[in-house]
Amino acid sequence: MPGIVTRFAPSPTGFLHIGGARTALFNWLYAQRHGGQFLLRIEDTDRKRSTQEAIDAIIDGLKWLGISYDGEIVYQSKRIDRHIEVANLLVEKGRAYHCYCPENEVAEKKIRAREEGKIYKHKCTHSTSNAEPVVRFKVPDSEDIVVDDKIYGQVTISSDQLDDIVILRSDNTPTYIFAVVVDDHDAGITDIIRGSDHLTNTFKQLLIYQALDFDVPRFAHVPLIHGEDGNKLSKRHGATSVCDYEKMGILPQAMRNYLLRLGWSHGNDEIISDEQAIEWFNLESIGRSPARLDFKKLEHLNNHYISNMSNEDILTLMLRENTLTDKKKGYLLQGLTELKKRANYLTELLDLAKFYIQVDLSEEAQQIVKSNLNVIKLLASFLSSVGSEDWNKNFLSSQIKEFSKLHNIKMSDIYHSLRAPITGIMDAPGIIDIMVILGKDECIKRLQAI
């Protein structure tokens, strides 16, 4: 499918949420699949609610996710002159008009119609006024508006259900409904993939496309994401913004895999690489029902990607805000092989690996140290006699068995007496493996520090 151009067009009124991230991913994958372009447009015409902080969060969120856009970012607010130009063109063509009706009057009529169970269809009743007018697009009477959606099929409503559409506010700023049509046309957008909550907007925008003789893009409206309880996603369901997931310790590749599977499927495949996603992605495999968040599935995916990442790459991520000596980095590089299998989050992995950096005795470890102090001292003395060249798993295991026989101490008590002072926690990988990684000097130092 040549010449595909998709876009992601968020409003910078908040952080990049998970629904927006999925929309961006689907548009990016569709463009990648067809050798097309993926553009980024910031829809910042709502001056009161748009913030630079939100713009930065959107850009940073896409960067973290690994979703790259083509060309320069388009800021909708910088195209207002173009929006006004096209609005005036519609007025000249008789497809739009200046409306002087006070906003509060229109709002009251809408409320009254709703209370009466009617559809309010605005017609301007004020030819002139001291107030600055809005520009309204004339919605034709009694016409079927048909959207040929790539997910829902043909969806039809009557134009009688629509009010005349405000396209320019009284301050000459464009409304979302209108600006999007102009911007998408000028950018050559061929395919619009967005949330199903935009379907009502599409009926209105289709009329504007037709009035301007613009080529109509293909539309695909993706069902929304719901919480695990089946209700519309909200903050009470937990993390909703991309930055929340990054802080939790989710890997971007795991997040991409997870977002892809929220509403799209490829047979029974769960673990899907970027290469496979680009090769397989299509609109036909997007379901019509809302996708549900499943944090257990996200944990499973994240554990998979953590487990399969190289120790060097994991260490780089773990140490972004920490400086360690080469010796401690060496401990971590060796220890991560076992630890990463246990972690569902990077933050969790950092906690699991903490004992390689420093020892903080847990309450349980403190109690064991207190109860086994004499055994710990004996072990420190006994292990000091082991040569550094013999400090390996097989030799240490045999020596500890000898120690058990010599002092008539259970092996389980010996392992506890080693684990508590050396790691500070009682739920860690095999203590002999840890001792080999730390080396003789560090182990003796930790045993003697008690």
UniProtKB/Swiss-Prot annotation:
Pfam families: Anticodon_2, tRNA-synt_1c. Keywords: Aminoacyl-tRNA synthetase, ATP-binding, Cytoplasm, Ligase, Nucleotide-binding, Protein biosynthesis. Its EC number is 6.1.1.17. One of its GO terms (biological process) is glutamyl-tRNA aminoacylation. It comes from the Bacteria. A motif ('KMSKS' region) lies at residues 232-236. Catalyzes the attachment of glutamate to tRNA(Glu) in a two-step reaction: glutamate is first activated by ATP to form Glu-AMP and then transferred to the acceptor end of tRNA(Glu). This is Glutamate--tRNA ligase 2. The lineage of its organism: Bacteria, Pseudomonadati, Pseudomonadota, Alphaproteobacteria, Rickettsiales.
